């Protein structure tokens, strides 16, 4: 089961972040009824819509596998107007965490197919505290203003020997991503993980007082 939540104000809270687990294994290249493929924005394990979403003390993971085989595979599509995550594990490979909104225009026909494809692009504010986020290609991406506070960022080894942590698509005049007092440590070979690359022209991402391994 893949929860799709569209409420004004709600809380998801587990008893233990390592024992309360939401899991699914849907990849963007999986077939979709009547269509060629699922696509990135229908691959989520958990969809957070609505007004204010609070998520605490649990794990959300997408176990579809490596993006080279299954395509993008979201653990969380964070699309609520305000998102707060505390003590949450987000595990995946390519495109683990999407922080809405989408860019205005897609580059591939039907590339945004999903719940928000034809919706207005509404700005969101997101805050992640003491979270563990794992992936290998563009695994934190999107157009939100988002703060990552004392989080552990875990870039995973990828067969291309290159890992990109972020891919912001920050709208003009928005702040983008801020990582504060975070630890970046994974299993990539030395010097193969990059802090980010732009998904759109105004992409913004800042790292402050973070600890980076080789």
Where are these regions (language model features)?
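Sequence-level preference for short, compositionally simple segments enriched
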Residues: 1-214
């Amino acid at each position: 089961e893949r929860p799709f939540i569209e409420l004004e104000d709600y809380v998801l809270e587990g008893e233990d972040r390592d024992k309360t687990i939401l899991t699914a294994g849907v990849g963007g290249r999986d077939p979709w009824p009547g269509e060629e493929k699922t696509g990135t924005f229908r691959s989520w394990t958990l969809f957070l819509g609505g007004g204010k979403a609070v998520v605490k003390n649990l794990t959300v993971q997408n176990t579809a596998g490596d993006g080279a085989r299954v395509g993008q595979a979201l653990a969380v599509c964070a699309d609520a107007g305000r998102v707060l995550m505390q003590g949450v594990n987000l595990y995946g490979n390519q495109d683990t965490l999407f922080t809405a909104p989408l860019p205005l225009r897609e580059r591939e026909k039907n590339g945004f197919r999903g719940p928000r494809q034809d919706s207005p692009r509404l700005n969101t504010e997101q805050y992640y505290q003491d979270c563990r986020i794992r992936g290998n290609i563009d695994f934190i991406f999107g157009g939100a203003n988002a703060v990552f506070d004392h989080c552990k960022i875990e870039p995973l080894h990828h067969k291309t020997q290159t890992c990109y942590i972020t891919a912001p698509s920050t709208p003009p005049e928005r702040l983008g991503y801020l990582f504060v007092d975070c630890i970046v440590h994974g299993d990539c070979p030395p010097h193969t993980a990059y802090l980010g690359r732009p998904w759109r022209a105004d992409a913004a991402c800042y790292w402050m007082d973070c600890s980076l391994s080789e």
